[in-house]
Amino acid sequence: MNGALGKVLCLKNDTIFKQAFSLLRFRTSGENPVYSAGGILLTTSRHYRSKPTHGIGRYKHLVKPEEPKKKKGKVEIRAINVGTDYEYGTLNIHLIAYDMALTESYAQYVHNLCNHLSIKVEESYAMPTKTMEVLQLQDQGNKMLLDSVLTTHERVVQISGLNATFAEIFLEIIQSNLPEGVKLSVREHTEEDFKGRFKARPELEELLAKLN
């Protein structure tokens, strides 16, 4: 009986020494015994430096940094392309209507059509809105009364390098798809067309004239 008890004590002491030796080996190698094979101890200390949810919900590292906005400079006049015997120079496609949404939509259609047909589009812009008052003469008397106010919207699609042989086909396409109520006109680009893009400021011009 004493011999069997001695063997059990020896085995128990042997396992304790092995566990202590493995713990000492983990400590000297810098390895955490809790998460290693054969670990026998549990620790209540936090193994992370911050909160468990630290970093969750961050998205700024996924978004590209925004580029600084460039200041809009003054629009300068470009050199006008005169054209050759085989192709037109700079042409302006004017679209005029009373409905702004219809004018804008058809201007986009013409722009996309030019891109599809490999026609170079220099730029697409809006002209200043024009208003016209309609006056009505009374049945009795010479006094004029305001009947309505008509607002005219204009969009311009500027193209260049249109082939002379293809020009007739191109104009026929945009004219056949012209919506009702939209006026179409195509003419060569001039310096007056460039100046007409901007609203006149007579007061500012007078002040500049006085300063100069």
Curated annotation (Swiss-Prot):
Residues with N6-succinyllysine modification: K199
InterPro entries noted in UniProt: Ribosomal_mL48 (IPR027487), Ribosomal_uS10_dom (IPR027486), Ribosomal_uS10_dom_sf (IPR036838)
TM annotation in the entry: none
UniProt entry keywords in alphabetical sequence: Mitochondrion, Ribonucleoprotein, Ribosomal protein, Transit peptide
Annotated SMART domains: Ribosomal_S10
One family name in Pfam for this protein: Ribosomal_S10
Keyword Signal: no
Any GO CC annotation of this UniProt entry: mitochondrial large ribosomal subunit
Residue interval of the organelle targeting sequence: 1-28
Coiled-coil features, chain-numbered ranges: none
Localization: Mitochondrion
Family label: Belongs to the mitochondrion-specific ribosomal protein mL48 family.
Subunit structure: Component of the mitochondrial ribosome large subunit (39S) which comprises a 16S rRNA and about 50 distinct proteins. Interacts with OXA1L.
Protein name: Large ribosomal subunit protein mL48
Organism of this sequence: Bos taurus (Bovine)
